[in-house]
Amino acid sequence: MSAIKIAIIGDFNFAYNAHHATNLSLDHSSNFLDEEINYYWIRPSELLSFKKNELLDYGVWLAPGPYLNEFYFSGAVKEVINSKLPALVTGEGFYHVIDYYVKQYSLNPRNEKVISDNLVSGNQFDSVQIAPVGSFGIKIYSTHNSIELTSTRFSVYPNLVEVLRDDFIYVDANDQFDEVQLFRLADRLDIIVAMYLPQISSTRDLPHPIINAFVRACLEKTEV
């Protein structure tokens, strides 16, 4: 059986623990699922120069920041959403996915600030209490600690959440403040979006089930 191929889209920085944890969490899932995984970091600016089907056999992880150029990362988010590739988004990419829908479907006609800036500063982690509300979230947290770590906190305008929930996303978990923390795209259930960083709490003995779910989606693609 051929190896699972995963493109990690982001600007790798050895000084950021979240970037190291991204690599390690894939190693954890590879060992747990007994599947070979080949993963590669690709800068967002490089992705936009790829040929249309160059990543056809890949899964994509839209990695946490910081990003050297937010414009290129936003473009990468758009490309992935409009592709047929299974994807995982963690950290700052949460903001960019929401922003994509707001702009693509004109969900903010008054041009108000409907999603806050990141409320966590620097290379630090805050804890967040996850409360599963959807089937995927309930399944994930039936076997995993509901305390997660995050370097990103965004507050989304409640009315926008309702519009997104009605037409565009399945909310799978909130936090203790009832802010959305985990969702999947309604028309692409193989795209998982987490505001927090599940890779941080993944270990070799207990790989994070969100990472496992993403890897399984990539595996299904290789078997088609």
Describe these PLM feature segments.
Residues 1-145, 150-187, 195-224:
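N-terminal beta1-alpha1 cap of cysteine-dependent amidohydrolase-like domains
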